[in-house]
């Protein structure tokens, strides 16, 4: 690539072989003369011209030329310059450097040089009448041109002479107003209003008016339709528009790029395919979709080809902007742009000052097009950059100082608001920011009578005590206010309550001393401190020395006759009936007794209205048995209500208990009762979750839960609810084992929803709902966390059923209950083919465009980007593939129900079940049948073993638990034949197919009482965690 100067008398043949002279007209009316070599690309020529202005944003500009037919064409950047259809006449080829692609506003442009070139291009288009503008708008724009070039108004004569030199008034405006003086007067009238505006402001205001014109940024081409009616075809980055030949302002038809399918040209015909759902399929002459409408225009072949090339480039520019919207910088404000343009000066002054006057040809040599004054301009530019950097750093420092002052003002306003209870109006708020909610601080200030405070010489002892009493009473009142504040933390509330009690105690001591002196002097004692104490009793938690919580709303249910304990503080009266609890104990024994007094009843976290099958609140309204009850009742199989009441020390009576008429649940389990399984549909039956916990981990967890007095597992689990006769009759809502797979457990999941997993929820029964909204209390949340921990441990050690779930990835499938997590190896595409809108590739670096321009006679361009989508990921393909395994099985028609306690992450289960569906079902059915036979044969052995354990407190409690669990298993074993069949049919296909052969072949112990020992390797008597292992025979399958 080389640029050389040649004389004007060069031969035509020499031009074709060695190069051709070209003259580039710049936007500032200068001309750049070059010798273009045959191998020079149009893109390289554009780079050379752009470097003359130090232009960085070259994507908006292009180089145009006029062909032999007089139509304007553009150089295609990927082709060589001399390959274009230039006129064959001798002389240099005239090229025009101008804007090709327009945008909404100049605020999106980064460089000031680009903005100034857009301004020069707009002036040129208006002057050459490429943009239709009303004459009044022309006069206003001419005034801005004068303000930008000449500054403020000086005189009418100067303005009239300047208007003759500047390209301000187009010929069309002069035709509409034949009087030149009238046009000049109108311009002067607007010009006088612009006094004081800087050059940058004039440019910004000029561009704002031009950008609001409907014809700005549209390339117009004269075409005809099939009937020969002339039209204007407008092309821009927004789409293709059809205008009436006598009206370029209002389009008659609009075709946006997102609605277009293909662009064709063939000789004199240019066609577009548009999505039109209202169009009938018979109007489509070729094969394809039915909602496609074809629009065709006609012109000469050269113009048709030019229109087609411009349409392709505009669509590619549209795609580039659409795909790079995330990379587009934030728009600058117009005021900031005006300041920058004023400081940097004119473009021609900074770049072309040494090039000579306007109209002079700029010649280049040795391939360099930079002017001789470029070094000086570069040095000035570096100095300006340094100055701007210094100003920017100063601005940042001032902004930081302002931010600090605003923070200080906010703190002062908040302190004032805490004192007054109202936020001051001076509080600084950002746009759209809500004022903060301020809580008024508890006032503790007080004022005393000076006569009582100031001593008067030798004061008597009684006067001194009266003065101290007056001060201490005010201090006590202030401490009471602080202790009554409900918006502080629990720890701070305890500290304030302690301070309040100490103040009361000191006040009582002072009054006692006063009464002693009054009695000595023969006066009557007073009771002022007692009255203050009676009025100052505050409602607060009694668990200041214990972490076990009981909610305040449970007080209405406590009807036991607890004898009030006297307060250790002197002078404190007994609590009113609404606070019928003992105060914080001062000894360890008192703390232990208080724990069982306070936890008399636990309220169910489940609202009764959500359960229509049975009242599930009844198992929660139970009596907490004391630890001594475990020793006294270990020899009983099922302790009666009376024994339980006696174990409570006689302080609690159950005659008025809310559970008087119900079966007496003496269990520590807080799991809700199970509705009768005979009225539930088969698809709610689930298999046992397999949780891999090592024996060492189980032992450590067992020791941990053994020492927690409030834990579920430390008290054992008594699942029986029969009378003293031992009849196997059960209450209708039978209990479940809290093994963590209960779908009615609380809704918290032990795993989080990952972005790479897809959860397909199941169709839930109307009687089952989540419990998140029902129990917002922190106490109940902690209680449910302990239940979940116990449930997870119980499920790990649960041995009432053989482990039917595969370990590892699919091991948790059985425990997932309902709802399946599908971990997709490749995420489905987020794009979908929509009927009315084409599909574009958003993430690609460049738009995918199919172009077939092989000759000068015809061409085809696909507007819609080609995009192939896998069948598995289109319009629900992933859903169909996931659930394909259960399509042919009647038992699989029901959806899976999600487990509410612990959902394990599993791979896609539907695909596994599609291979060996029959074998998996048969294996599960056979395993269930073998387990049922072993359980039936060994039942009598469990009953015998349940009466031979030790009578110690620890082993006695465990023995009672195991014997009751054995009894429950025997009482429900009569329903096992039906449940085996229902379970086999209702198990999801994915769970049946995931049974490993190794676990099917393994033979677990026949005794459900020793399954925990078989799984964990621990002795049953050494592990108090038994609530999840002794479950009913069908428990593992229906949960």
Curated annotation (Swiss-Prot):
One example GO MF annotation: protein-macromolecule adaptor activity
Composition-biased stretches (Polar residues): 896-905, 986-1000, 1013-1023
Annotated region (Necessary for interaction with CYTH1), positions in chain: 358-420
Record-linked PROSITE patterns: FERM_1 (PS00660), FERM_2 (PS00661), FERM_3 (PS50057)
SUPFAM superfamilies: PH domain-like (SSF50729), Second domain of FERM (SSF47031), Ubiquitin-like (SSF54236)
Pfam families according to UniProt: CUPID (PF11819), FERM_C (PF09380), FERM_M (PF00373), FERM_N (PF09379)
Region of interest: Disordered: 366-386, 553-680, 713-756, 772-813, 879-968, 980-1039
Chain ranges of the FERM domain: 20-322
Keyword Amino-acid biosynthesis applies: no
Gene3D superfamilies in UniProt: 1.20.80.10, Phosphatidylinositol 3-kinase Catalytic Subunit, Chain A, domain 1, Pleckstrin-homology domain (PH domain)/Phosphotyrosine-binding domain (PTB)
Bias kind Low complexity: ranges: 366-382, 788-800, 946-966
GO cellular component: adherens junction; bicellular tight junction; cytoplasm; cytoskeleton
InterPro entries (alphabetical): Band_41_domain, CUPID, FERM/acyl-CoA-bd_prot_sf, FERM_2, FERM_central, FERM_CS, FERM_domain, FERM_N
Disease: Agenesis of the corpus callosum, with facial anomalies and cerebellar ataxia: An autosomal recessive intellectual disability syndrome characterized by congenital microcephaly, low anterior hairline, bitemporal narrowing, low-set protruding ears, strabismus and tented thick eyebrows with sparse hair in their medial segment.
The protein, known as: FERM domain-containing protein 4A
Organism this protein belongs to: Homo sapiens (Human)
């Amino acid at each position: 690539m080389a640029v050389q100067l040649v004389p004007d008398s060069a031969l035509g043949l020499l031009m074709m072989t060695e190069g051709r002279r070209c003259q580039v007209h710049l936007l500032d009316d200068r001309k750049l003369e070059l010798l273009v070599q045959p191998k020079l690309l149009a893109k390289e020529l554009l780079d050379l011209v752009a470097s003359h202005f130090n232009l960085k944003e070259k994507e908006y500009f292009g180089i145009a030329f006029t062909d032999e037919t007089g139509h304007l064409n553009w150089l295609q950047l990927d082709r060589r310059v001399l390959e274009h259809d230039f006129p064959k006449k001798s002389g240099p080829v005239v090229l025009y450097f101008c804007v090709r692609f327009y945008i909404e506003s100049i605020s999106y442009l980064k460089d000031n040089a680009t903005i100034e070139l857009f301004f020069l291009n707009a002036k040129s288009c208006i002057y050459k009448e490429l943009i239709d503008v009303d004459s009044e708008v022309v006069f206003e724009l001419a005034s801005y041109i004068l303000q930008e070039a000449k500054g403020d108004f000086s005189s009418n004569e100067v303005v009239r002479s300047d208007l003759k030199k500047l390209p301000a008034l187009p010929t069309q405006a002069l035709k509409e107003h034949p009087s030149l003086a009238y046009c000049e007067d109108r311009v002067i009238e607007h010009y006088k209003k612009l006094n004081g505006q800087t050059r940058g402001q004039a440019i910004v205001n000029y561009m704002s008016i031009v950008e609001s014109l409907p014809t700005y940024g549209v390339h117009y081409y004269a075409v005809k339709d099939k009937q020969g009616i002339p039209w204007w075809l407008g092309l821009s980055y927004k789409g293709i528009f059809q205008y009436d030949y006598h009206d370029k302002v209002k389009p008659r038809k609009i075709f946006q790029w997102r609605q277009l399918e293909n662009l064709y040209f063939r000789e004199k015909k240019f066609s577009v395919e548009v999505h039109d759902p209202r169009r009938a399929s018979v109007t489509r002459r070729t094969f394809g979709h039915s909602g496609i409408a074809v629009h065709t225009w006609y012109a000469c072949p050269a113009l048709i080809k030019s229109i087609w090339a411009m349409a392709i480039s505009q669509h590619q520019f549209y795609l580039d902007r659409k795909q790079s919207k995330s990379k587009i910088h934030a728009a600058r404000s117009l005021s900031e742009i005006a300041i920058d343009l004023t400081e940097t000066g004119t473009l021609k002054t900074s770049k072309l000052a040494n090039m000579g006057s306007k109209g002079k040809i700029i010649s280049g040599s040795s391939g360099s097009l930079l002017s001789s004054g470029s070094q000086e301009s570069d040095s000035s530019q570096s100095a300006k950059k340094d100055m701007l950097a210094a100003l920017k750093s100063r601005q940042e420092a001032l902004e930081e100082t302002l931010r600090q002052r605003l923070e200080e003002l906010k703190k002062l306003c908040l302190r004032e608001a805490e004192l007054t209870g109202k936020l001051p109006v001076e509080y600084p708020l950002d746009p759209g920011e809500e004022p903060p909610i301020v809580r008024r601080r508890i006032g503790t200030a007080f004022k005393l009578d000076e006569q009582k405070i100031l001593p008067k010489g030798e004061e008597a002892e009684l006067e001194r005590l009266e003065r101290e009493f007056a001060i201490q009473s005010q201090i006590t009142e202030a401490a009471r206010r602080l202790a009554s504040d409900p918006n502080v933390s629990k720890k701070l509330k305890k500290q304030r309550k302690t301070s309040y009690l100490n103040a009361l105690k000191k006040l009582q001591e002072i009054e006692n001393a006063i009464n002693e002196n009054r009695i000595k002097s023969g006066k009557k004692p007073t009771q002022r401190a007692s009255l203050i104490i009676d009025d100052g009793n505050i409602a607060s938690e009694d668990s200041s020395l214990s972490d076990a919580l009981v909610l305040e709303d449970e007080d209405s249910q406590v009807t036991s006759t607890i004898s009030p304990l006297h307060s250790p503080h002197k002078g404190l009266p007994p609590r009113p009936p609404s606070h019928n609890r003992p105060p914080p104990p001062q000894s360890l024994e008192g703390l232990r007794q208080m724990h069982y007094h306070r936890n008399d009843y636990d309220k169910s976290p489940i609202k009764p209205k959500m359960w229509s099958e049975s009242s599930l609140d009844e198992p929660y309204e139970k009596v907490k048995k004391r630890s001594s009850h475990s020793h006294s009742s270990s020899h009983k199989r099922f302790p009666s209500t009376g024994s339980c009441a006696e174990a409570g020390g006689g302080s609690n009576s159950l005659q008025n208990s809310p559970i008087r008429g119900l079966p007496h649940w003496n269990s520590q389990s807080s799991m809700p009762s199970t509705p009768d399984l005979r009225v539930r549909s088969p698809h709610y039956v689930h298999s046992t979750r397999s949780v891999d916990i090592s024996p060492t981990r189980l032992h450590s967890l067992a020791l941990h839960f053994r020492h927690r007095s409030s834990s579920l597992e430390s008290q054992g689990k008594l699942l029986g609810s029969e009378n003293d006769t031992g009849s196997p009759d059960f209450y209708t809502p039978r209990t479940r084992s809290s093994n963590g797979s209960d779908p009615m457990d609380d809704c918290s999941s032990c795993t989080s929803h990952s972005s790479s997993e897809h959860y397909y929820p199941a169709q839930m029964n109307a009687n089952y709902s989540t419990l998140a909204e029902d129990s917002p209390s922190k106490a109940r949340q902690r209680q449910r966390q302990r239940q979940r921990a116990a449930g997870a441990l119980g499920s790990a050690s649960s041995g009432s059923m053989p482990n039917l779930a595969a370990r590892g990835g699919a091991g948790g499938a059985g425990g997932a209950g309902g709802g399946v997590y599908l971990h997709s190896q490749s995420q489905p595409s987020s794009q979908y083919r929509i009927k009315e809108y084409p599909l574009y590739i958003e993430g690609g670096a460049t738009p995918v465009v199919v172009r077939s321009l092989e000759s000068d006679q015809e061409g085809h361009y696909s507007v819609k980007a080609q995009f192939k989508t896998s069948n598995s990921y289109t319009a629900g393909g992933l859903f169909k593939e996931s659930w394909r395994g259960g399509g042919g099985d009647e038992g699989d028609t029901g959806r899976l129900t999600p487990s509410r306690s612990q959902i394990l992450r599993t791979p896609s289960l539907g695909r596994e079940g599609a291979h060996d569906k029959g074998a998996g079902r048969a294996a599960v059915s056979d395993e269930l049948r073998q387990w049922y036979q072993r359980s039936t044969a060994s039942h009598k052995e469990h009953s015998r073993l349940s009466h031979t354990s030790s009578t110690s407190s620890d082993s006695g409690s465990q023995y009672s638990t195991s014997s009751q669990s054995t009894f429950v298993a025997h009482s429900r074993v009569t329903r096992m034949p039906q449940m085996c069949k229902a379970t086999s049919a209702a198990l999801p296909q994915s769970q049946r197919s995931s049974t490993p052969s190794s676990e099917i072949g393994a033979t677990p112990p026949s005794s459900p009482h020793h399954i925990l020992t078989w799984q964990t390797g621990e002795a049953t008597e050494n592990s108090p965690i038994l609530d999840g292992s002794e479950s009913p025979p069908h428990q593992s399958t229906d949960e």
